[in-house]
């Protein structure tokens, strides 16, 4: 077998149906769209969510919550990412330089996701209770 000899099995591919090309084709004149009506016109279809004038579901349901504008200043980093960073001392600037947190991040929190075996000293970074225990068990510290 060679790459240039690979082809689909017989009958696997169907030719595209050419519509609107004369009565002999069986799909001439109205091209399978029937007579008149919105769906027979070009561009004739309702927008997504339109329910024929009835109040759409998206507007019937109540609004809930809001998106905090502070989220862009907060960042999370996993224990695995901290381990792979390979630095003995880590601060927010080091994480920004490594591309692990965004440029706007002001508060960084380590979450317990994965494992850590190297001793890492964190400064200016917070951690969850589980992550703190894992870092200290590996010989690291939080300042």
Swiss-Prot record:
A cellular-component GO term for this protein: cytosolic large ribosomal subunit
An individual GO BP term: translation
Oligomeric form and interacting partners: Part of the 50S ribosomal subunit.
SUPFAM superfamilies assigned to the protein according to its UniProt record, in alphabetical order: Ribosomal proteins L15p and L18e (SSF52080)
Official protein name in the record: Large ribosomal subunit protein uL15
A Pfam family the protein falls into: Ribosomal_L27A
Bias-annotated ranges (Gly residues): 21-31
Molecular function in Gene Ontology: rRNA binding; structural constituent of ribosome
Originating organism: Acidovorax ebreus (strain TPSY) (Diaphorobacter sp. (strain TPSY))
């Amino acid at each position: 077998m060679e790459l240039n000899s690979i082809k689909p099995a017989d009958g696997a591919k169907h030719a595209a149906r050419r519509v609107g090309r004369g009565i002999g084709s069986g799909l001439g004149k109205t091209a399978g769209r029937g007579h008149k009506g919105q769906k027979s016109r070009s561009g004739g279809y309702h927008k997504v969510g339109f329910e024929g004038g009835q109040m759409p579901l998206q507007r019937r349901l109540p609004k809930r919550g809001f998106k905090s504008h502070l989220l862009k200043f907060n960042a999370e980093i996993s224990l695995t990412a901290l381990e792979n960073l390979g630095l003995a001392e880590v601060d927010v600037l080091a994480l920004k330089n490594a591309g692990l947190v965004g440029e706007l991040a002001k508060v960084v929190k380590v979450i317990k996701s994965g494992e850590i075996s190297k001793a890492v000293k964190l400064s200016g970074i917070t951690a969850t209770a589980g992550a703190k225990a894992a870092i200290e068990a590996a010989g690291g510290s939080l300042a």
